[in-house]
Structure formats: structure tokens, C-alpha cells
């Protein structure tokens, strides 16, 4: 059954006061780190976050497992408030290729040094789009795209883009980043 048009499924039935309360509980004392992992804020929670002026100093946003979808990603990527982010963790948000495109073309996320897009149903199409814009992310050092559906075409496009971009750590395969040397 498709619940995509359901207000509750998109988080539209949640009052902004509830989102504000979650932000206050999970915001660091210095106001620079916000961990909203697994709070299931969904699309409208992402919209609320993207418009909170109090989050302008934020440099680190952990927004994994919120199931915000591509429209929620669009709110965050186009936010005029979240322009100081250096780290954005968006694992498991069901963004797909549409969502990754919003990140790729965002002028507001160019300060990112770390971007985690793990487990988001991204395919070659999204990877190739991201690869085209990767050189514009001059501060990006680490890009994590593990556990997606990226095949050789997408991986090769990203590896080629990495050669002219600042990205030092490009994680594409599920075993990368977990290797322990004895």
C-alpha cells in the first residue's frame, strides 16, 4: 500500500513545536551540532529544520533515518539557514536520484567537508549527476555513498570526478571504511 500522499507518512501532522522541542533536546550547547538521527521527522520535519533561524550557526547535522524523501532533501539543500554546514549525514532517507540531484546543485552546501548519503536508493543516474557537480564542492574531503545501487558507470564517473575534486575519501563499496589492519 502506498502511503506517500498520507499526511502522517510525510510528517505533515506533526506540529512545528514538536520539531522545535526535538531540536532543543538534541542541539549541542555551542549550537553547532545537531543530532536528529532516527527521529523520523520526514519531509515536513526537514522543512521545519530548514527554516529555523536559530540553526544558522550549525556546522554538523546528523539527519539519518528520518525518511524525509527527495522533497525533504530539497528543503535542506535549498535552506538559506543551513549554509554553514561542514558535515551532513543523510543516511537512510529514501532520497533516491531526485534527492541527490538537489544536493548536487545546491549552492548552500558548498562548505561541506563530510557528506554521508549511505543507503538512499541512489543509482548510476544520481551518482553521475553528483559526479558532474563534485568539483564545485571544493571543501569536500569525504563522500560516503555505500549501500546504494550504484554500478560501474556511476562508480567510474565518481572516481573520475574525484581526480579533479578535493575528495580524498570516496566510499562506494559496503566494505570500505570498515577494514581493520592488524
Give the predicted meaning of each segment.
Residues 34-36, 49, 61, 76, ...:
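Hydrophobic beta-strand residues in large extracellular and virion-surface proteins
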Residues 137-182:
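Leucine-rich solenoid repeat scaffolds
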Residues 34-36, 58-63, 85-90, 112-117, ...:
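Conserved hydrophobic beta-strand positions in leucine-rich repeat
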Residues 2-73:
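LRR N-terminal entry segment and analogous cap-like coil->beta motifs
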Residues 64-81, 87-111, 116:
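Alpha-helical adaptor scaffolds
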